[in-house]
From Swiss-Prot:
Keywords: Cytoplasm, DNA-binding, Transcription, Transcription regulation. Its main location: cytoplasm. This is HTH-type transcriptional regulator rgg. Residues 11-64 form the HTH cro/C1-type domain.
Amino acid sequence: MLIVKSSGKILKIIRESKNMSLKEVAAGDISVAQLSRYERGISSLTVDSFYSCLRNMSVSLAEFQYVYHNYREADDVVLSQKLSEAQRENNIVKLESILAGSEAMAQEFPEKKNYKLNTIVIRATLTSCNPDYQVSKGDIEFLTDYLFSVEEWGRYELWLFTNSVNLLTLETLETFASEMINRTQFYNNLPENRRRIIKMLLNVVSACIENNHLQVAMKFLNYIDNTKIPETDLYDRVLIKYHKALYSYKVGNPHARHDIEQCLSTFEYLDSFGVARKLKEQFERIQLTVVADLQIE
């Protein structure tokens, strides 16, 4: 496999910014002449040679991509950030604008499956903010068929599933979440993917708690408990504590309310008001169901 010639000029920009010579970057792994031709766009490099050059400059692939994309995140990362922000703000107008742009791309490039998948995820996000908005059965089948077809889930598949939890049946959620644990073995040691896995599982846990699928909720909470979460990942740790308390409250422990309120206060203290609002709305829904269950008893 070859690295395209056009990326050579980016490597040169990074090399010169580090005040390194061609010889230092080549470092005996490839010839100086070969590296020079690559930088000038005359020839390509093999993947192994390309990674050797990055390693010799102490540059990560993510850093290279950031420069390659003109000092901005990759398109899928930008889309993910925009969606998360609009969802936290409950900004339906912004979501509809993002959707319109994605639909246009999907129509212009029908052969590119990711544009259609992105569009489905945006529609799913809209439904989470506006229950009156519906996603077609065909879209849901297209998404699930794609996820089932991928043997090893990476960042993109985790993102797709995490943001479409509200579209799927509880049985499908359990199946996918269980499969996901097996299908991310290649990537789950990457910090970014580990965080995505935790986020995905917590979304599944939320859906299960709200729909009284409590055994499954406990199954995935136990899995999370056995996952080593770094102490510095405070956001994940507070979210996990919140969901464990929410489960406890749902199964009849009124004292869990204190832990829930502490988690909400923590997010508010950190000025994460959008997150706090979403979780508070969820807790209020759970409270109503608990009261209703007590009245039935």
